[in-house]
Amino acid sequence: MTPRRHVLLFMAPFCAECDRARALLERRGIAFEEIDLSADPERCCELEALTGGRSAPQIVIDGRPIGGFAELSALDRAGGVEVAESAMVR
């Protein structure tokens, strides 16, 4: 059994790409922590430290940035986010 990964979804309200990223993770049954950057602006600093930027959405798995919705979607098409999650194991 694959160990559970810590998945963060940095998002903003009224962000269509954020909604798509959330929906993809939910569809795949992947547990994630949703961080609303507008409700917790201090987390913007955390996002910038992890990814080098402040754009939303951003997906981070076990402290490693995956990217935004486009990158998440590409990973899903290439074998599923589940595969990407398990690839994070080192």
Predicted feature locations:
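Local sequence-structure signature of Cys/Sec-based thiol-disulfide redox active-site neighborhoods
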Residues: 1-33
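Short alpha-helical
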Residues: 16, 42, 67
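Generic recognition of short, well-ordered alpha-helical segments
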Residues: 19-20, 45, 70
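Non-catalytic interaction surface on structured domains
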Residues: 22-24, 29, 49, 74-80
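Structural signal for short hydrophobic segments within the conserved structured cores
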Residues: 33-35, 64
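Thioredoxin-like thiol-disulfide oxidoreductase module
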Residues: 36-54, 83-87
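Non-catalytic, surface beta->alpha helical segment in thiol-disulfide oxidoreductase systems
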Residues: 61-90
